[in-house]
């Protein structure tokens, strides 16, 4: 997608378990298809209301997307989810079962979470884990350079929205370089 909030991809990662616990845990995520900016939360449930709470958080922070892409999980095909999208004039785009690669950006984020958060952090307490994950998401958006957006962070790309209305990398790179200090320099 070439414009911010033209489409977001949503997914649920999990379940995963903490040491010495049978409690299921999940990450519910929403990613802007253009800037790669992520809104994500740790949840002990994966119900439609939890997915909607996260989508509402995304909208409050980033504005309303034109379209939401998701798999066919029951959280995304429920009446309450679809009704929310209709009432808010957000298009609904579900991908066919068995084709997660169609949501490659959110799946790539999930892989990063598995490899750089779950595999690295020793988490024994849900509340502490939620704080750590919140810091991870913040660092992902604000500090982690992204190859798919020319080495800029998702927040740098998203913050350019006030000056630009497109994520066309050929046009945006020069303008971002002029206005933002590149991470790591």
State where each predicted segment sits.
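RNase H-like two-metal-ion nuclease catalytic core shared by retroviral integrases
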Residues: 70-72, 76-85, 92-115, 127-131, ...
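Active-site beta-loop-alpha junctions of metal-dependent nucleic acid enzymes
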Residues: 23, 40-62
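Acidic/histidine-rich, metal-coordinating catalytic segments
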Residues: 46, 62-78, 150-155
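Short small-residue beta-strand/loop micro-motif enriched in glycine and branched aliphatics
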Residues: 35-41, 93-95, 119-120
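Basic, flexible linker segments flanking DNA-binding modules
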Residues: 1-10, 15, 99, 153, ...
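An active-site-proximal beta-strand-loop segment
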Residues: 4-39, 44
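Mobile genetic element proteins and their domesticated derivatives, centered on retroelements
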Residues: 11, 30, 36, 55, ...
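C-terminal domain-tail junction helix/linker
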Residues: 88, 112-185
